[in-house]
Amino acid sequence: SSAASDVYKRQEGHVQYAFMTIREIERFYSQYYPRWDARAYYGLMELLAVAPGQRIARMSCGQRSQVALGLILAQNADLMILDDFSMGLDPGYRRLFVEYLRDYARSRGTTVFLTSHIIQDMEKLIDDCIVMDYGRILVQMPAGDLLGRFRSYELAIAEGAALPEAPEFHRPTAIGGRAEFYSFETEAEVAARLRQAGIACDTLRSEALNLEDAFIGLTGKY
């Protein structure tokens, strides 16, 4: 029906018309969304330093992607679904949008469901974290706790020696006299466990992880 068609138009995505300018495409889409908020769109355009009269056809792929995302934000929806939103964005534009999206969602109370293959993008957006491996939950905790507690460890060991088998040591490897593993234990706790197994830990060192490193440490590199 016509009524149903109108509802779908308000909830579906958009088509980008390259012959339009920044201002023209905003005016065009504003007709179809009753909760349209042009400020959300133009706020992002100002950060991109693009003029309202600039034609989309003359913009880079990254800028065009940001225009598309700005049009989505302007719809002022209660729920936004962004599937692989970072495709086509270089690191600078990606970070700009992530920070803009974070502030947008917090100020409006908007629910945002998003997917991304770039895990570090999530660090600025999430409060709680669930890491799964083939349907099995490995970790469920606040993201700050995961990044604050889970660390990588490295030390020199005798050729042919092996780390002790312990559930506290995640993804242990020993190659060429170097051992690496991940753990939620503190450096003092790890050192005590190694000494108990008869392994010298004078060369033991630990390193804090970002979210991507933590994910690899929990699930494996491949």
Regions found by a protein language model. Give the residues of each.
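C-terminal coupling/interaction segments
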Residues: 183-222
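Helix N-cap at the start of a conserved alpha-helix in ABC-type nucleotide-binding domains
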Residues: 91-93
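Short, small-residue-biased leader/transition segments that mark boundaries at the very start
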Residues: 1-8
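Short loop immediately C-terminal to the Walker-B catalytic DE motif
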Residues: 86-87, 119
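ABC-family P-loop ATPase nucleotide-binding domains
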Residues: 11-67
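ABC transporter nucleotide-binding domain
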Residues: 96-185
